[in-house]
Amino acid sequence: MPADHHPLRSVLETVGPESCPGQFNFHCHTLCSDGSLEPLALIRQASSRGLTQLAVTDHHSSASFQPMQDWLKQQRDLGETVPILWSGMEISAILRGCLVHVLALGFEPAHKSLAVYNQGDAAVGEALRAESVCQAIHDAGGLAILAHPGRYRVGFADLIDAAAELGFDGGEAWYDYDMQTRWSWSPVVCEAIDRRLKNLGLLRTCGTDSHGLDLEGR
């Protein structure tokens, strides 16, 4: 599926500073990588808090996706209102000589192009290059998103520009760089990142990057 026609695109086009953590969360973790919650505990919490759309983005693992999808189907069959879950994974990559993280969203979890990234550890060699990561995500039918652009040793403007040149679909605009107990996006830096992404015609996402027991905290 071409990224321009991806069904998640229309959702991400509505993301704003107030979308996270109550409505959307496209960046969080479970015990399948370095998070603290079991996958089913996370999806139950997301459902009980009224989230409408989310993706769990464990590092180099999509193992949490199917168990959560199975639980959501059970709940829908019982007539419950539950969130829409998109496949997700956080992948390490080298961009402009800097180690960055790329969020893969809405891809086919078993696709062969992502096998090298879906084994629990970062890839090596050519597969670690950002262009290789982006192409693999697209080959698997997903969207490639630059995670937390303001967290790296290279400035966010250079990284966003480089990502755009490589065909990335977007960047994580709304993020808590102060890592507060309760998630809140960081003024100034998030607004600047959002403007740059918007000016380049890129999608903007949001997420708590939760690794703990509370989806609304870091």
Residue ranges with predicted function:
Residues 62-86, 181-205:
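Short acidic, glycine/proline-enriched helix-loop-strand junctions
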Residues 41, 156-162, 185-192:
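Charged helix-capping and loop-helix junction motifs
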Residues 2-21, 65-170, 217:
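Extended substrate/RNA-proximal surfaces in nucleic-acid metabolism proteins
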Residues 201-217:
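Short acidic/histidine-rich active-site segments
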Residues 43-64, 84-86, 142-145:
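Divalent metal-dependent hydrolysis catalytic cores, especially in the metallo-beta-lactamase
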Residues 33-36, 60-64, 151-156, 179-186:
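Acidic-and-aromatic substrate-binding clefts and catalytic sites of carbohydrate-active enzymes
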Residues 29-31, 59, 88-94, 107, ...:
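Active-site beta-loop-alpha junctions enriched in small/polar residues
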Residues 24-26, 54-59, 86-89, 145-148, ...:
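Active-site neighborhood of phospho(di)ester-bond hydrolases with catalytic His/Asp-centered motifs
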